[in-house]
Structure formats: C-alpha cells, structure tokens
Amino acid sequence: QGTGIMVGSPGQNTDHLVEDLLFIEQFHPEMIGIGPFIPHHDTPFAACLPGSMEMTLKLLSIFRLMHPKVLLPSTTALATLAPDGRERGILAGANVVMPNLSPPEQRNKYSLYDNKASLGAEAAEGLQQLEEKLTVIGYRISKERGDY
C-alpha cells in the first residue's frame, strides 16, 4: 500500500505537515509519495506559489528516517522546481525515480501541472540521460523490481 502528501498546497501550514507525518505513520506504507505543489493554469490555484523545494527535501529526509525500507520517489515535480531537483531528492533520502517514458508528442495529453520537467528526449534517450545524471551523484539505476 502507498500514501503521500503534496507539500505547499494552498492553505497548508507546518502543523498540517506534522499531522500528515503522524497520520501516515499509522499505515506502515510500502511507498510514500512526497512532492511539492505546482499550480496548473486551469485551476482555482493557478496564481498560487509552488511548494517549497527545501521543505519537500526535509520531509523526504524525515520520512526516510521514520521508514528506512519504504519506497520513496524523487518526483518529477522536484525537477520542475529546479534542474537538479530529482538528484537533490535522491540525496535527501528518496530511492525511486519514475521517468516519463511517454512519447514526447503524447505528453501534453496528461498535464498535472504547468512546465512539467522532461528531458525532452525520446523515452530510451531520456532514461540514458537520467542514468547519467544519477551517476554523477554516485547512484545507479536498478531496473529490478522495487519490492518493499
């Protein structure tokens, strides 16, 4: 089972994040998805600021300490906030990357938020570029099952 939180949602404060930490603790999840809020132009939150990179990284680190074996993705949303966001997520404690392998001409049909990070390459090229970026920070991609 999995669960997660969006960091920096409009109206969210630190007390809410602490409540989320404690709430998630009850589930003993196998995967926890944590990513920053990023506004989409077609929503009531279009003019809102995105969530904080630093707070998202702190929460990744906290969840890693609380759940040493959990599958913890470094999200595309982190890479949308900063070019090295995905790598920073890994360094903060994430252990999963989920590259966008959709063909570039199809990606606009699935738009969760504006300016979504993409390596802009074909699926195989994008995976190779991601592997190279992670190698620079001392990690490698395993294509094995990521069982809990």
Residue ranges of model-derived segments:
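Active-site-proximal beta-alpha loop/turn segments in soluble metabolic enzymes
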Residues: 2-12, 39-46
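Auxiliary Fe-S-binding modules of radical SAM enzymes
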Residues: 25-148
